[in-house]
């Protein structure tokens, strides 16, 4: 309980709750945490709360790192990895709703994962990088010419399809004229 009391000391609103309601800070913190967990698990507010916490906690640390004259390499790496993972999870939410609906407690798991991965003190971003991302072969994401080459390939493909469609349209129009 001493550890919980120390954490509760960092949250000013818990002082007001303790004075007005005569509830100890650590119990108020536990109650609020439990209430938030129930809301995440049992209501449609789960995605909103999860995304909000997933943004606010690391955003503050990201701003601190960005304002440093010489940020530590590990700090910058941690935040880059976190925002990349956050983007992937948010994309999963947005585009794979049908799949995610079959994963029990998805937003609860995402909530705790983001609380672990976001703050620098847990080093979640570094752990993810060292154990997963650093092991991805470079050839998977570096190609001759890099991004420029991939964009050129995509542009050429779109151009080919567009030309093909225009040619079909011309053939149809010319066949109508001959009829």
From Swiss-Prot:
TM spans (from-to): 29-49, 76-96, 97-117
Primary localization class, coarse: membrane
UniProt GO cellular component terms: membrane
Keywords: Membrane, Transmembrane, Transmembrane helix
Places the protein is found: Membrane
Record has Transmembrane helix as a keyword: yes
UniProt membrane topology term: Multi-pass membrane protein
Superkingdom to which the source organism belongs: Eukaryota
Family stated for the protein in its record: Belongs to the DP1 family.
Protein name: Uncharacterized membrane protein ECU09_1950
Organismal lineage: Eukaryota, Fungi, Fungi incertae sedis, Microsporidia, Unikaryonidae
């Amino acid at each position: 309980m001493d550890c919980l009391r120390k954490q509760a000391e960092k949250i000013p609103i818990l002082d007001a709750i303790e004075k007005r309601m005569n509830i100890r800070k650590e119990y108020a913190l536990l109650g609020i945490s439990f209430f938030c967990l129930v809301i995440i698990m049992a209501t449609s507010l789960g995605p909103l709360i999860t995304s909000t916490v997933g943004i606010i906690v690391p955003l503050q640390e990201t701003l601190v790192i960005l304002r440093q004259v010489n940020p530590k390499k590990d700090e910058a790496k941690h935040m880059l990895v976190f925002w990349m993972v956050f983007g992937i999870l948010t994309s999963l939410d947005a585009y794979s709703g049908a799949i995610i609906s079959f994963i029990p407690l998805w937003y609860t798991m995402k909530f705790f994962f983001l609380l672990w991965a976001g703050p620098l003190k847990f080093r979640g971003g570094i752990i993810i990088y060292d154990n997963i991302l650093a092991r991805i072969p470079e050839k998977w994401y570096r190609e001759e010419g890099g991004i420029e080459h991939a964009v050129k390939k995509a542009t050429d493909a779109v151009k080919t399809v567009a030309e093909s469609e225009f040619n079909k349209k011309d053939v149809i129009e010319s066949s109508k004229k001959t009829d």
